[in-house]
From Swiss-Prot:
Changing P65A: Loss of interaction with TNFRSF14. The lineage of its organism: Eukaryota, Metazoa, Chordata, Craniata, Vertebrata. SMART domains: IG (SM00409). The gene is Btla. It is a single-pass type I membrane protein. This is B- and T-lymphocyte attenuator. Residues 30-183 are extracellular. Its main location: membrane.
Length: 306
């Protein structure tokens, strides 16, 4: 049994027949598409004499509803300058997008944000089957922002029921930034307060330490003076009221000895400021040691401050 290429003669003839079949099929499909497009043309449904108001610094947008059947057309925005509509250049502050979550797809022009120079009339257009279709114009009135901006709310497109106020997201974006700043400043303020308290405590302790050092030194001097004075007083105490001092050789060699004891007590407890004891001893003459015996003389004075 002969195959199809054999029946056609050669493989080259079979390839040409296949290409001809694809060409005829594409022509038929194109005619059907054109027929559908003619039955359902593209429509740009912007209401005539549409007007909108905006304030500088707001996030603003205008919408162009587009009706189509099969293929989404290529739509552009332009701004009227006299009798000419100048196409807009896309930038981060001025860009377009499609919103197809509605019953009618919408081609949107975004102002992020809007300025006084954006004041004017805008329209959208498309090229459909070698024919340019223009929409009605939308006029935007841009005014300076004042302090009491709540008296002049943003006006949206009247012919689109689902249009939203573009100034809302800006406040929502500002609130997280302010909250983050507040959460950052609170711990920083608490840390500074804690550091100030620690520095104040260290300063007070240092002052108290300086005040304690002179009193400690005075106590040490008093103790050092009291110990030899008491021991010496006990050593030189008389055995009886009428007895004579038994002076040691060292004390007898001195013509006159004077011992002064100064005591300084704490300011709030003791009233005695100082006490002095003068002890005068007439030394023995070693040459007349056997013939003469001299009695010592001593006296004490006490001063009390009220």
């Amino acid at each position: 049994m002969k195959t199809v290429p054999a029946m056609l003669g050669t493989p080259r003839l079979f390839r040409e027949f296949f290409i001809l079949h694809l060409g005829l099929w594409s022509i038929l499909c194109e005619k059907a598409t054109k027929r559908n497009d003619e039955e359902c043309p593209v429509q740009l449904t912007i209401t005539r004499n549409s007007k909108q108001s905006a304030r500088t610094g707001e996030l603003f947008k205008i919408q162009c509803p587009v009706k189509y059947c099969v293929h989404r057309p290529n739509v552009t925005w332009c701004k009227h300058n006299g009798t000419i509509c100048v196409p807009l250049e896309v930038s981060p502050q001025l860009y377009t997008s499609w919103e197809e979550n509605q019953s009618v797809p919408v081609f949107v022009l975004h102002f992020k944000p809007i300025h006084l120079s954006d004041n004017g009339s805008y329209s959208c257009s498309t090229n459909f089957n070698s024919q340019v279709i223009n929409s009605h114009s939308v006029t935007i009135h841009v005014r300076e922002r004042t302090q009491n901006s709540s008296e002049h709310p943003l006006i949206t497109v009247s012919d689109i029921p689902d249009a939203t106020n573009a100034s809302g997201p800006s406040t929502m974006e500002e609130r997280p930034g302010r909250t983050w700043l507040l959460y950052t400043l609170l711990p920083l303020g608490a840390l500074l307060l804690l550091l100030a308290c620690v520095c104040l405590l260290c300063f007070l302790k240092r002052i108290q330490g300086k005040e304690k050092k002179p009193s400690d030194l005075a106590g040490r001097d008093t103790n050092l003076v009291d110990i030899p004075a008491s021991s010496r007083t006990n050593h030189q105490a008389l055995p009886s009221g009428t007895g004579i001092y038994d002076n040691d050789p060292w004390s007898s060699m001195q013509d006159e000895s004077e011992l002064t004891i100064s005591l300084q007590s704490e300011r709030n407890n003791q009233g005695i400021v100082y006490a002095s004891l003068n002890h005068c001893v007439i030394g023995r003459n070693p040459r007349q040691e056997n013939n003469m015996q001299e009695a010592p003389t001593e006296y004490a004075s006490i001063c009390v401050r009220s």
